């Protein structure tokens, strides 16, 4: 008979005895061998065994050692933590006592909050009123007056032509703040393609002294010389404007008012961006600026700026596209015939400015990219510089202008303004501002160097108002009856140079959207939406009674005029004539390029006539109607 489990002597057991009390009160420990027979463990095995001898005895438990190690480690951590806490506490107490001592010694110590921005090391020159002389009035408005003048630095025998912008005596604190903000922005820039501030005079009325641009603004310049401007000039201007705007973007400045009227011509080869009355400086962590109101140029603004008053560097790109369109159409008005209040809906429906007749698809596509609804889809200014620089190396490939290779700008010495300048002042020792300031980057006390007189270096100034976009003939554009060359080509592949002059030339249109005589012409715009009646017909149209300020000398585009004026405001406008000394003709403050209540289907009555001090900070379009900035409802 065999046991089912183990054999312990004569007995069958389920398990070998383990710790059973035996003889002499000793514990008996047994283990099962290979035959399932219980055998006694070695006498020294006091906790059982797994085999014969001492080798079968179990090892001692490691649990106490592990527990001891864990407890010891925790104690060490607690001690180290207490030590660190005491150290930090003592350091905090020392710092607190130090700050308390500094506060007692210096009365106030502001906490340090570094922004990471580079310091603005621009110099603001404070000029004495005796250092400059006002020569003649260039223009005036509700905010003040702009003079042509001469800056004669103290202790030097040079004269620098300048424009002096002076606020009125009874100017509001807000207007003073706006002109000082403008001075801050202009003093912070230093670029060949951005107009610079020469100084500020803090008399009873604040005065800004800026560079005087002898050729006036670019809009006026291209309108006057449209028959002599070739493709190379147009593309070079596009490059220079893009360079100026790229510089402003690098300085985190949003211009908000880029247009051809706000680009000044120093020489036909050199243009500069001006009018920083609306410009805003973004902080290091800001990417957009939210405007609260003010006068805004609706037809040059991006859609997000019109609808939400959001201004970014990419909204400046949109304005740049419209500015390029102005250049390529030789001063045409964007969206002519469309009321400013409808611009947002027109843009939302996908309509854009038409392709100028002289532009190839390459140039027009750049404009279209600038007018994308998605701001991030628009090109950057550095990309625009690269594109137009490439085109400027081969102008006839991208702009098709008849007789392009024979075009040259007329001698500026024939201009009326140049002759007036010569007659009015002793022009000896006249020096250009840029040339004068080169050796004076530090300040005014550096020694004078040899300079080239302005009259010999600048062969002239234009017959424009020196710093203003003048609307000639009271129409906002010149009338050139002797223009006989058909300059526009709708088909870039056509060889119009082979046509004979004797075949009969039609007068070139003054604007792309102007109707031509009965004979078909390639100068007509293909998009009929923008076609307009002839210049003569425009001047004969009666003003719509729905709009205010309908002077005979006002801009004949009533849909742009401010309808949100109280009777008081209307009376002030209609009874406030402004005169230009040179032309002696009356003008109006209304300007169609800027509107007040530009949000769709929204009008809020405003009983106050408000023309901000920054209406045109640089040169104030002298003969141009002055409603270009119409107040935007907050």
From Swiss-Prot:
Protein's organism: Avian leukosis virus
The name this protein goes by in its record: Tyrosine-protein kinase transforming protein erbB
Reaction(s) catalysed by this chain's protein: L-tyrosyl-[protein] + ATP = O-phospho-L-tyrosyl-[protein] + ADP + H(+)
PROSITE patterns with a match to the protein in the record: PROTEIN_KINASE_ATP, PROTEIN_KINASE_DOM, PROTEIN_KINASE_TYR
UniProt-listed Enzyme Commission number(s): 2.7.10.1
Keywords attached to this entry: ATP-binding, Kinase, Nucleotide-binding, Oncogene, Phosphoprotein, Transferase, Tyrosine-protein kinase
Membership in a protein family: Belongs to the protein kinase superfamily. Tyr protein kinase family. EGF receptor subfamily.
Misc remark: This protein is produced by erythroleukemia cells in chickens which have been injected with the avian leukosis virus and subsequently develop leukemia. The leukemias are induced by the insertion of retroviral promoter elements in or near the c-erbB gene, which leads to c-erbB activation.
Example GO molecular function: epidermal growth factor receptor activity
Enzyme class label: transferase
Protein biosynthesis listed as a keyword: no
PANTHER family: EPIDERMAL GROWTH FACTOR RECEPTOR (PTHR24416:SF91), TYROSINE-PROTEIN KINASE RECEPTOR (PTHR24416)
Binding site for ATP: 138-146, 165
Classification via InterPro entries: Egfr_JX_dom, GF_recep_IV, Growth_fac_rcpt_cys_sf, Kinase-like_dom_sf, Prot_kinase_dom, Protein_kinase_ATP_BS, RTK, Ser-Thr/Tyr_kinase_cat_dom
